[in-house]
Amino acid sequence: MDISPIIISMKTATIAILFTFILGLLAARWILYRKSDATRIFWDGIFTMPLVLPPTVAGFFLLVFFGSYGPVGKLFENYLGIKIAFSWGATILAAVVMSFPLMYRSARGALEQIDEDLIFAARTLGMSEWSIFFRVMIPNALPGIISGGVLAFARGLGEFGATAMIAGNIRGKTRT
């Protein structure tokens, strides 16, 4: 029995959750500070899009953008010498994109539940916005943030559709 797909999946999900966790938290914080409702709704829709798209469609979009002839893929190949499509990095990219909405939505929900009086009190004590985020908001939202991380890890671990589209099914390299 070949266990390399299990090992590749575990490595991919572990590295992907590091990116997803940070990006999801930062995106949730960024959305909370948007003043315009139209801007919030637009970006919230963009951030949650991979959650409602079929995985193969999301993988197709990733292939279009990050493939050898796509705008981002061509840039990476020509200027950095890095080929994204059909590589192990593509499995990480697919896992990050597909698991990001779960982390983002969980973090946003947890951050929105924080009592605003705590934030106002921290501001009156002279804390910077980033200090408030790390010392007040994250500790109070930690259960929701952790649950988002667990959901995102599970989604990244089980991702196949988008991965098959952008990374292929190369034995010992991208087969998840």
Predicted regions and their residues:
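Glycine-rich helix-loop "coupling/hinge" segments at transmembrane-helix boundaries
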Residues: 63-64, 68, 162-176
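Glycine/proline-centered hinge or cleavage motifs at structural transition points of membrane proteins
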Residues: 125-126, 139
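Short, conserved glycine- and acidic-residue-centered signature motifs
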Residues: 42, 89, 118, 170, ...
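Membrane-water interface segments at the C-terminal ends of transmembrane alpha-helices
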Residues: 1-112, 136-161
